[in-house]
Structures are given as C-alpha cells and as structure tokens.
C-alpha cells in the first residue's frame, strides 16, 4: 500500500477548523468521508497542521493510504466530484515515501492575512478580508513586523489552551504589502502556535489604529504576558498559503 500526498485548498468559512470533531463539520471529516466512499473502508488522513475555525487554505498538505487500485488522476476526479460542493478541492496527488509525514517533515509554513483598507468596495469583497476603515501606514506596520524576525518566545501571542511545550518559534519573513484596496500581511515561520498569527495581526493593527508608539509592539512581544496582547484578528481573512519541505 503506497502513501499518497495531496495538495488541497479549501474555504474554511463553513467549517469548525481542520481537525475532525465528532458533532461538527470539519475539513478532515469531509475528506475522510469522501475517501471512505471511494475506498469502501475508513481512511485516516494526516495533515501539515490544523487550521482554526474559519481559516482558509490555498495549499494544505495531507497524506493517506488506500488499498484500492486506482490511477491518481481518476482518484483526484472522484474526490473532487464529492468535495467541490463542500468548498474543498484536491489540487494535486502524488506518491511519497512511507517515511514522509506532512507535519514532521515540514520545514516552514507560510500564512497570509488580508486587510480591506478602503471605503470603495463591494459587499462581497469583505467576505475573506478584515475591514479596517482607518487608513493604515504600511511603513509603521512593517517596522513592527521587523521585530518578529528571528527566534522568539511567543508566549504573549499564544492561546491559553495551546499545549505546545515550547513557545519559541523562528520567523523567517514578515511583511505588509499594498495590493490595490487591500493590505496583505505575509509571514513565514518554522511553525505557529494556536491563534498566534491572528493575535500578532490584531495587536499590530490596534497599535496602528490608536496611533501608539511603534515600539509598543516590541515591548508587548518581549513581555511574555498574554494579557498585553490586543484583540485577536478575525479568522475569515487568514490563509495557509503553503508548506515548505526539503
């Protein structure tokens, strides 16, 4: 039995996160149900990470094993015939070594956050974006983002329920970019704590909106005090962009 890697994309709006939950709709639950229809037996999938409720993915990585003999192209078509109506799409399928694990083999992960920073927009343009009516300074936001680069203790931006033994994470890239009426924040790190990216975004935006000193963000980061973090930014504007492997 060969291990199959799948690149998948999904709209997380209707799901209670990626990880399976017995009584709530999840991305993992829908994919495993689709695989069971095709395989006729239960199939367990493994992912590169668990996105929270409402968070989207442009290229999430999962792996699974199935016993039936089917060409990958036909398997992709069969899965998409079931999953597309549920806002999940299989982008690619390929075989990988049995030693490969989508989470533990990953080197880096990239997320993006979409901020709608204009009054000139259609109602549906805010569907997967966080609307901020005050004009934001890209320069100020990027000065705060620079302090994230390197290895830091991110206790301040962790969730109380996060069970990670270490709160240290390595951030390789963090930058805001203007794209028309949107401001896009991109961040690449070794991995991320539960709700860490949204907590970082929410804090930076709050400091900028209130015209506080840029140095406030670094002070909050170094404090290792969860109570100093500001409002967590909404989930609907966060995207898992890609996962990096060797």
From Swiss-Prot:
Its EC number is 5.4.99.12
UniProt entry tagged with the keyword Isomerase: yes
Q: Where are the transmembrane segments?
A: none
Catalytic positions? 52 (nucleophile)
> What molecular function terms (GO) are annotated for this protein?
RNA binding; tRNA pseudouridine(38-40) synthase activity
The record's listing under InterPro entries reads:
PsdUridine_synth_cat_dom_sf, PsdUridine_synth_TruA, PsdUridine_synth_TruA_a/b_dom, PsdUridine_synth_TruA_C, TruA/RsuA/RluB/E/F_N
> Which GO biological-process labels does this protein carry?
tRNA pseudouridine synthesis
- The broad enzyme category this protein falls into is isomerase
Q: Where on this chain does substrate bind? A: 111
Catalysed reactions, as listed in the record:
uridine(38/39/40) in tRNA = pseudouridine(38/39/40) in tRNA
Q: Which UniProt keywords apply?
A: Isomerase, tRNA processing
The disulfides recorded in the entry are none
Q: Per its UniProt record, what Gene3D superfamilies does this chain match?
A: Pseudouridine synthase I, catalytic domain, C-terminal subdomain (3.30.70.660), Pseudouridine synthase I, catalytic domain, N-terminal subdomain (3.30.70.580)
The record's annotation in SUPFAM superfamilies points to:
Pseudouridine synthase
What's this protein's function? Formation of pseudouridine at positions 38, 39 and 40 in the anticodon stem and loop of transfer RNAs.
Task: Note the PANTHER family from the entry.
Answer: PSEUDOURIDYLATE SYNTHASE (PTHR11142), TRNA PSEUDOURIDINE SYNTHASE-LIKE 1 (PTHR11142:SF0)
**Subunit structure, interactors included:** Homodimer.
Family to which this protein belongs:
Belongs to the tRNA pseudouridine synthase TruA family.
Q: What is this protein called?
A: tRNA pseudouridine synthase A
Naturally occurring in which organism (per UniProt): Borreliella burgdorferi (strain ATCC 35210 / DSM 4680 / CIP 102532 / B31) (Borrelia burgdorferi)
């Amino acid at each position: 039995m060969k291990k199959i890697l799948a690149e998948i994309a999904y709209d997380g709006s209707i799901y209670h996160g990626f990880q399976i939950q017995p009584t709530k709709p999840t991305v993992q639950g829908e994919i495993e149900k689709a695989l069971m229809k095709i395989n006729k037996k239960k199939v367990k999938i493994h992912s590169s990470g668990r996105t929270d409720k409402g968070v989207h993915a442009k290229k999430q990585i999962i792996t699974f094993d199935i016993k039936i003999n089917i060409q990958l192209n036909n398997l992709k078509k069969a899965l998409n015939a079931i999953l597309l109506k549920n806002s999940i799409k299989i982008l690619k399928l390929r075989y990988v070594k049995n030693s490969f694990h989508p989470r533990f083999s990953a080197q880096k992960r990239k997320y993006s956050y979409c901020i709608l920073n204009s009054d000139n927009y259609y109602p549906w343009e805010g569907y997967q974006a966080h609307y901020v009516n005050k004009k934001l300074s890209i320069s100020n936001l990027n000065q705060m983002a620079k302090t994230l680069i390197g290895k830091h203790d991110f206790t301040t931006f962790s969730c109380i329920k996060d069970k990670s033994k270490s709160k240290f994470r390595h951030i390789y890239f963090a930058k805001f970019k203007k794209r028309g009426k949107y401001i896009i924040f991109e961040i690449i790190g070794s991995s991320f704590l539960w709700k860490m990216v949204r907590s970082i975004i929410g804090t930076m935006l709050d400091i900028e909106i209130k015209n506080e000193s840029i140095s406030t963000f670094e002070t909050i980061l170094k404090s290792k005090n969860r109570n100093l973090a500001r409002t967590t930014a909404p989930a609907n504007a966060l995207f898992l962009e890609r996962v990096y492997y060797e």
